Amino acid sequence: MDLYNNIAEVMQKKGINCVVGDIYDLQQVCKSWYRGNVNDFHNYTQTLVDGSICEVERLTMSMPKKICEDMQKLTWTEKVDISLDTKKKTEQLWKILDSKENSFTINFPAFLERVYALGTGVLVEFIKDGKTIIDYIDGDLMIPYKYTNTYINGLITISQFVEQKGKDKLYYTHLTFHEFENNKYTKYNELYLSKTLGELGKEVDFATKFPDIENPKIYDGVDTPHFQVIRTPIANNFDMNSPMGIPIIANHIDKFKSIDTKYDSFMNEFELGKKMVLVDRTAVKGGKEVDASGNVRDVSYFDKKNKVFVAVNGMENQPVKEIDFKLRTSEHIDAINADLNYLSAGLGLGAGFYKFDGNSLKTATEVISENSEAFRTKRNYETVVKDVVYDL
């Protein structure tokens, strides 16, 4: 967040008002859930009965990742047809789209999934070595500065790289300005250098690192810019003054916590609920034996890796005691499914879209009727996807 504010402060001095707000904090929260590992939740400390503290990992169903995957599959498939008015033009188009550099068939669905995870993304096209290149840029690497409602026609994309100079590391931040107005697309670059990670630093001559890039680059008389912003089609209730979209998982963090808490408990049920046999501690002590060669060695009368037998004090002259816990699997499964129904309904997919059977997670993507909630949500998301592909 400091870098975004740092950029905004520097740009304000140049008369450019960047929109930062709270959206980038939200993106980082959602990104950690999308990755499936949230600090202080999936990794936490626990105090044991003896007062010692141990680190514990909470298991996850990875629902944020699953949701973004499924929404991508609902709104974009390999059956989508992109064609121009002639067969020859269509072939030329696909030659560009599915070049080794662009690999649109593979990269666009992955990009779309990340858009759903972060709320926003941008495609940028440029020429490199005579080839048209598509850059798939995530929403946390762009800052809008010119927009009308949710239509963004001025933005900054961010890229960073590091150089080693002796014992020091030099952190470079490359800012690219994209602006489209009055049928003119302008692309301008700035370069900043810092010795501290996360800071913008001071502006340096862009040409020192990129001498072959024309700067600025102006395209006059164009109908569309060489960039397309895509955002989720849901209202931004976290930062209502921002033109950025919000992650589709943003309003469901509490549900993810509830699901993972129950799932972790469900999996622990099989570990903690295992059959145990209590024996006196003296019964598991080893002894000394003489082998065939006359050597004395220590032997254990119990397999140390055997978790069934548990040694306790105070059971002298008592028979072994068997404890067999009753597993609460059905209660856990029902509780998880109740949360999944609440979650899928909140996503606009309808209750019952997800179902956990104890072994795997089932998804009702096979048949979606035209009058279902999931179908209407699918159509809503398809609209923004079609718009960005059409402009591309």
Role assignments for model-derived ranges:
Residues 1-153:
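Extended, helix-rich architectural segments
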Residues 210-369:
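Extended, charged amphipathic alpha-helical segments
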Residues 61-63, 106-113, 120, 129-131, ...:
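Intrinsically disordered, low-complexity boundary segments flanking structured domains
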Residues 89, 100, 104-108, 251, ...:
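Short amphipathic alpha-helical segments
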Residues 26-58, 311-346, 362-385:
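Extended, non-catalytic structural segments that build the interaction scaffolds
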Residues 18, 36-37, 74, 78, ...:
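Short secondary-structure junctions and interdomain/linker hinges
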Residues 390-392:
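A preference for well-ordered globular domain cores
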Residues 117, 122-246:
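Extended, regular secondary-structure scaffolds
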